[in-house]
Amino acid sequence: MLGASSSEEEDDDFQEDHDSLPIAQVKKRSLLSGAMTPRSSSPAPSDSVSQTNSLKRNNSSSQGRRKDSVQSQTPARSARIMSNVSKPIMQNSQEFDGDEEEGEEGSTTVVGSGDECGGPALSKEEQERMKAEREEEDHKKNLQMYMFLARCIAYPFNGQQTGDMARRQMKVNKQELARIRERFTLFLKGETNIAADEAFTKAIQSYFEVFLKSERVQKVVHAGGFSQHDFREVFRLNIEKRVRSLPDIEGLSKDTVLNSWLAKFDAIIKGDETDQNRNARGRSRNPQNAMSADAVLGKEQLYDVFQQILGVKKFEHQIIFNALQLDNPDEQAAAIRREFATREEALKDPIKMKRLTPKFVVKDMETLYMDEVRMSINTLIGNLETVPVTTRGATVGKRKDKSRSRSIEDLSLFNSLKRRTSSGSLNKGDSEDGDVTLTKSDVSLALSMEVVVMEVQGLKSVQPSKIVYCTMEVDGHKLQTDHAEASKPKWDTQGDFSTKNPLPVVKVKLYTEVKSMIAFEDKELGKVIIQPTPNCARSPEWYTMTLPKSSQDQNLKIRIAIRVEKPPNLKYCGYCYCIGRNAWKKWKKRFFCLVQVSQYAFAVCSFRQKKADPTEFIQLDGFTIDYMPESDPELSAQGGKHFFTAIKEGDELKFATDDENERHLWVQALYRATGQAYKPVPPKQSTIAPKAQGFQDKASKHGMDAMIQADSINFDHDHFYSDVQRLTLDFRINEPICSLGWFSPGQAFVLEEYSARYMVRGCFRHVTLLSNLLDKADDGLLIDPALIHYSFAFCASHVHGNRCMPDRQGPEGVGTVTLEEKEKFQEIKERLRVLLEKQITNFRYCFPFGRPEGALKGTLGLLERVLMKDVVSPVPPEEVRAVIRKCLEDAALVNYTRICNEAKIEQRMGIDVSPAQRIEDMIRVTEFCIDLLKENEEHHGEAFAWFSDLLSDHSEIFWSLYSVDLDSALEVQPHDSWDSFPLFQMLNDFLLSESSLKGGIFHNKIVQQFQPLVVRYIDLMEHSIAQAIDKGFSKEKWESRKEGCATSEDIYWKLDALHTFVIDLNWPEEDFRKYLQTKMKSLTSDMISKVSDCTFTAFDSWMQRAKKSTDYMLPSEVCVQINVMFSSKSRAVRVTVDSGEYKYQSKLDETLETMLKTMESCIQEKLHGVLESVLSRLARYDEGNPIGAILNIAPKPASIFNKLKTMAGDTSAQATTTARQPLTAQQSSGQIGNSYVTFFHGCTELLRQVIIDEIWVNGLFEHWYDNQMKSINEWLTERLQQSLSATQYISLSTIVKKVYQDFSLQGIDEERLNSKTYQSISRRLQLEESNSHIQEAAINGSAQGSVFPTSLGNATAAVSNMSSMVEGAGAKMFSLFK
């Protein structure tokens, strides 16, 4: 840095104090989160100079010199230097955790030991004194840095603070994580008022178990890398996949479900009102409110922020604020101009510049370095000139919204002049002829005035009821007040005027209204003429009015308040005596104005009254202002007491004022305008103590005067900046904002302004920032890789000489590179490579669940950038892939080791652990492994999109590590144990679902490993089922079970289980899969054949026991056997053989069909045999059959016994017998039919209830019905020539009626029931019924005729004749049925 020190000893001391400081920097705007919007190019480029801020940096890289320097220091200074020990480059963050703490705790004691320093051990008092000295020196240094930062905050001119950065979210800390877990626990227990359905509760349960309770999440929370937004995004992505996979619900969109779930999630995570209020109170206690930390901050807020960062106390800030006049923009702009002038002067001294020039990687860069310094200074000057001229207290860098000081024409003139002066200033260092010549129009002023007429006193010549008013006139423009009564002449009327004359004339006249017809104007009562200046007092004053000659008032006064608003370009004005060579050649008192045309153009102008343009003016460029300790007697005799002068080569101006304080104000204003390095000092005989002197005395009292008066060029701003940046980063990391290393807009704005104003080398800034960020990353904090990427790319472009900023380049695009920058960059590059490889290796734990978003992808991109040899040549893809492959190989070991530690596999490999427990442990480990790989694909697959094959190799390596434990667990399994099959199914299903792992090394290994086990298991199951068939059916009781008997259910359950097992295996190899299918078909066919054969044999045995009487009931065992056959048939479908487009029934299926048909025929035969037996019994009642005649006697008593009773005259007995005879006869005649109906009903109910195949039962019923009707019809056809007896008729009627009704209830089709056969039977039975009624009627008629004994013979003859007639009619009727 220019003028950083005056001797080699001071250089060495200063450099050693900063040997161990971190090196970092921040990229403009993009690096610092977009906090700057430069007005023009920054003067601190990567290649541009730090105005020799790198004072003797080449010495700092020499270890030998550092050692010699340390040994030559005092014990206190040696301890201070040695306490800052740099960390090893290759050391990882886990090693840092312990080593750093030990180094920090023991640095003060170890350094002071006799072994280390070669002297006696330091006492406790000396150590405390040394510690206090170090703290005092650090605090002084912080105060000095704060002074420079305060100047940057007070008057920024290289950019402005913007709020276009991405707003950072609130950080989730350990306490907040515990509260969030507690809220979710309460929700899952149902102790909240949040309504939720089962699906949402399951989603929350999964989120709680997988995410919130994850140890990885807890570690990242401790690292400050998670915000509530990250928590919400993880939940949103999780439920989005769930909801999107669900089928659509009519009337309910999936977006509505998602929004509802997210609203409930927000309600859970925020808690109730009590929790929210507690959190709000906790944040409000924070010194810097987290809600506004990333907002655009005002100056006072920025002061407060950096007071906290640097540990500056409020009173110290106030001292610095007052001493530096931070609220005075003119003073701040003047200080900047003085800084530039000092740097330009140092630049013109080749000898000094050569001594202060740092050591470059190429010797020829020294000349380029000088050009960069000059270019940077000119850039700063250009930036300063773009700042509009402002008044004291106005916001720098922004024009006023409403200004009455300038017209539109004046502003356009000012802007054009600003451009002219700006372009001229860029070349002023190269040529003295480049000065800008001002014109009178450039220094014109535009003032605004406010004239307020308040009241009049002494008005007695006017009647109290008269109306009076006032007029105001400035430069010909008149305004009038309101009317008032003469008794109370008071107003509150303000007149606004604008003028270009700094010495305006204000005329105020008092009038009274004259209502006379002949009066042309009102009467003037008095007037006053005021000549205000911009320095006049703003308080109201009483003025004596000039009265007309005829006025009767003696002492008429008016109270007027006048305020003249100074324009922004008028910096000071007042009356002075002046004489000069080129202007104001006569010593006289004139009204002077100091006018600022631009930031670098000032002029002293003299004005006269009623003249808008200056009479004369001189541009102050090149003048030096100073006090004149002694007055000029010759000039003081003509006027003026206190002198000061402005001197320039070829011209000299002498000024004098009547007031000493006025002189001091003029000197200070001119001193600010000239930008001179020399500060005028009041003469000793001065009795005026200026306000600034009081502030400096107060600063001196607190020991801060030296740092306040120090010149900025005497400090190494590179290392100052690195310290400020490091402390700011520490402060930012500790904020409740999830910053990931990004500065807030306010912090970034101030740091950028500092680096630009004091020309900190760009590469040095970024290297320092990289070092700080890597230190934070090594400490376990989470840093955004994009932030590191920006800085690294900037440094790489600078060091390799390929930059993309034309305005910051030297000749042919090459910039200066110091030796220290290159060495630090190589060191950072190696540290960064190690860190990135470590993060990629631990990607699941550094970036859990893919958060922060895009961080892993950015890390991979940054690794590729780090591996590049230079900026132009891209790194070969194979080299990048080799590094990532190695990282993922290590990641596989890390991930599986952590899973084993979590499952405690190593501890459970002892002898006391059973083989079954080993398999259970492996199943649990397998679940962890599958979940891990699924998470990798879900959360990190996108980041590894360009390296998907490497991620697949990582998974294979992961499974290869797993296979070692798998083999160990399988080796201890017994020969007849099949507990490992679920493990294979789990692995196989997952591997088949992953296209990258399907058919891979591990997949093929487990297939070959489990194939013999599968074959042995199926063979064993086949033998077991065959034995179960033989033993089971020999003892079977044929009790109904679900779809068969106990033995068949057991057999088929085993077959189904085996079949399901083979299907669930989902064997990946096609040949063995076909073998398993064929094997299962063969096995199933054999077992079904055995079951059906045994069942059919038992069925045949049971059916041989059947009887043909109505007492016989079909056994339920037979129905169970039929069910077994149907169960066998349903399973026989699985062994059908596919052949092209057709399906052919297997032999087994045909056999079962034949058996079922045979069983159906057998049952029908046995059931039909009972009907045949009944019909045979009824045939014995035929007419003409002797046995039938005997059997028919009972049902026909009316022909004999009724006659006897009638002849006996027992009429009462006859009536009773006649009434009871039909019922008794019917009951005795229908016994045969009722017994068959009972048999029929029991069989149908049994068949319907027990047999499971309703179709088969319906078919059986239909055939049985047809056969019954056919048999009955044939039986009746055989008896067409004879009528049925009562027994035959009643039995058949009962049988036909009940059979019809029962089969109708059983679901037989109506059309089938009403067949022709049934109709024929019905007609015959109806005819028999009619015949029976006729016979009964004939019998009843003969009974009535028997009361007359004489006619008994005639009645008998009549009955005989009727009988023959009926028989003849019957013969004719029966002939119709043939």
From Swiss-Prot:
- Function per UniProt: Calcium-binding protein involved in exocytosis of vesicles filled with neurotransmitters and neuropeptides. Probably acts upstream of fusion in the biogenesis or maintenance of mature secretory vesicles. May specifically mediate the Ca(2+)-dependent exocytosis of large dense-core vesicles (DCVs) and other dense-core vesicles. Specifically required to activate the neuronal G-alpha pathway. Functions with G-alpha proteins from the same motor neurons to regulate locomotion. Involved in regulating entry into quiescence triggered by satiety.
Q: Where is the composition biased (Polar residues)?
A: 51-63, 70-95
Name any GO cellular component annotation.
neuronal cell body
In this protein, which residues make up the domain named MHD1?
964-1095
Give residue spans, biased composition: Acidic residues. Answer: 7-16, 96-105
Instruction: Tell me the ranges covered by the PH domain, including all copies.
Output: 569-675
Q: Which CDD domains match?
A: PH_CADPS
- Family matches, as SMART domains: DUF1041 (SM01145), PH (SM00233)
Q: Which SUPFAM superfamilies does UniProt cross-reference here? A: C2 domain (Calcium/lipid-binding domain, CaLB), PH domain-like
Q: Which stretches are annotated as coiled coil?
A: 121-184
Segment Disordered: which positions?
1-138
Q: What name has this protein been given in UniProt?
A: Calcium-dependent secretion activator
Q: What is the lineage of its organism?
A: Eukaryota, Metazoa, Ecdysozoa, Nematoda, Chromadorea
Alphabetic keyword roster: Calcium, Coiled coil, Cytoplasmic vesicle, Exocytosis, Lipid-binding, Membrane, Metal-binding, Protein transport, Synapse, Transport
Which locations, inside or outside the cell, does it occupy?
Cytoplasmic vesicle membrane; Synapse
Its chief place of residence is membrane
